């Protein structure tokens, strides 16, 4: 496991007329403030990455489809320096929130043929200045 990366199981509350899917509470580990939330659609088989945020803490949730994430730690002062971590998230199999700290490289791939959506609840607003590709 990469130092600072947290995988938090989330609740799905079944209700008549449609389920409620938890995302992030202010009281939970991983919450580092609120800057913005955005959704990203990933087509089946498409890989998006590599990306690295210099300041942003990402809280990634997959409410629709299935997304595989690969992370890499190049932080020289980290206990997990040069390690990889993989995790696949989906509502049906592994409904969790993936918290990714700044300076960890990551990429992701859509695994569902119909639709794949991830939600990022970020602690700061997105800026190209703090993003490496």
Which ranges hold each PLM region?
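Non-catalytic, conserved peripheral segments adjacent to functional cores
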Residues: 1-94, 111-133
């Amino acid at each position: 496991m990469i130092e600072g990366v947290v995988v938090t199981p989330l609740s799905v509350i079944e209700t008549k007329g449609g389920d409620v899917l938890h995302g992030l509470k202010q009281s939970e580990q991983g919450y580092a403030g609120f800057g913005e939330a955005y959704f990203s659609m990933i087509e089946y088989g498409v890989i998006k990455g590599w990306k690295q945020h210099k300041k942003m803490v990402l809280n990634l949730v997959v409410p629709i489809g299935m997304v595989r994430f690969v992370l890499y730690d190049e932080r020289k002062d980290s206990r997990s320096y040069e390690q990889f971590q993989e995790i696949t998230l989906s509502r049906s199999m592994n409904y969790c929130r993936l918290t990714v700290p700044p300076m960890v490289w990551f990429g992701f791939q859509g695994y569902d043929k119909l639709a794949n959506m991830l939600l990022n609840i970020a602690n700061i607003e997105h800026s190209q200045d703090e993003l490496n590709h």
